[in-house]
Amino acid sequence: MVDISIIREWVAKADEDFEFALVNLKEGKPFVALICFHFHQSAEKCLKAYIVAHDLGFIKSHDLPALLKICAAKDPSLIQLSPDCEYLNTFYIETRYPVHWPTHFTVDEAERARSSAQSVKLVIEKNLNLA
């Protein structure tokens, strides 16, 4: 059995990313790309908490669909999170590094990222009996 404190630590870090993004979004901060990135990070850490909790073979990856696939091997119902993970996955590379194509994220996209991250967070935390 995995030490529950490790799982709680992953979830706490996910909560920090979510709350940081949420506060900045609500305050109308102009850093939309970073807000979207932190919503991605929240979902990533939730998925990793699930992987650790069920000893599913931790991998160093930021690819949400790949992490979700590992989680869904344990609980196929988690596949319902695929659209959210696919959407959030677009915010990892493009928000962190210079790219050679135009990138501009809107507040509406950040709101959708919030909704997707919240869906992942709620489903995973409920599944872990932490909600």
Name the predicted role of every residue range:
Residues 1-131:
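Terminal alpha-helical segments
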